[in-house]
Curated annotation (Swiss-Prot):
InterPro entries: Cyt_b6_f_Rieske (IPR023960), Rieske_2Fe-2S (IPR017941), Rieske_2Fe-2S_sf (IPR036922), Rieske_Fe-S_prot (IPR014349), Rieske_Fe-S_prot_C (IPR005805). One of its GO terms (molecular function) is 2 iron, 2 sulfur cluster binding. Its EC number is 7.1.1.6. This is Cytochrome b6-f complex iron-sulfur subunit, chloroplastic. The chain crosses the membrane at residues 69-89. SUPFAM superfamilies: ISP domain.
């Protein structure tokens, strides 16, 4: 009987069937109908429990693997959003005239005088503008702030368009649209120029105000107004 238990231990399915037959009458033993002793059942169960534990992953291991897989998928996506994450916070510090104080990447008000100390001629740096939109604050060649800001949202599919100082233009990384240094579209697939805002200075702070006048770059009415 011991040899039978050992031979079935390597096959759990067969072992379970053998367990089910224990305790039933056994024919042909020469003493009538007898039953296998209860101790045989105990021995068989012990053999089944001898399967190495490292071959059966427990719940903790499976949960850990699931978390690692989720992290591997999520991290690249998060990494793509981090550079522009500061510009998706709710807008604030507006005034009664519909303007919006420009915010830097840390959420602080942009002070015109301090900004010009750290941003040189022809600089274009993202700030938070009207309705929280990422908006470029422009420094002119004469080291003064331009009276306009440029909305950084591409007019093709809404990607944030980075400034390429080496080529003196805005180049969208999504589909290759290009805009000149004032945000006028010079290459598609974007159909329109980047939107404009007024950039005024009020009490030392840069204030973005909606642009509803003619687009000075094209001579057309502003499509965004």
């Amino acid at each position: 009987m011991a040899s039978t238990a050992l031979s079935t231990a390597s096959n759990p399915t067969q072992l379970c069937r053998s367990r089910a037959s224990l305790g039933k009458p056994v024919k042909g033993l020469g003493f009538g109908r007898e039953r296998v002793p209860r101790t045989a059942t105990t021995i068989t169960c012990q053999a089944a429990s001898s399967i190495p534990a490292d071959r059966v992953p427990d719940m903790g291991k499976r949960q850990l693997m699931n978390l690692l897989l989720l992290g591997a998928i999520s991290l690249p996506t998060v990494g793509m959003l981090v550079p522009y994450g500061a510009f998706f916070i709710p807008a604030g510090s507006g005034n009664a005239g519909g303007g919006q104080v420009a915010k830097d990447k840390l959420g602080n008000d942009v002070l015109a005088e301090e900004w010009l100390k750290t941003h040189g001629p022809n600089d274009r740096t993202l700030t938070q503008g009207l309705k929280g939109d990422p908006t470029y604050l422009v420094v002119e060649a004469d080291k003064t702030l331009a009276t306009y800001g440029i909305n950084a949202v591409c007019t093709h599919l809404g990607c944030v368009v980075p400034w390429n100082a080496a080529e003196n233009k805005f180049i969208c990384p999504c589909h290759g649209s290009q805009y000149n240094n004032q945000g006028r579209v010079v290459r598609g697939p974007a159909p329109l120029s980047l939107a404009l805002v007024h950039a005024d200075v009020d009490d030392g702070k840069v204030l973005f105000v909606p642009w509803v006048e003619t687009d000075f770059r094209t001579g057309d009415n502003p499509w965004w107004a």
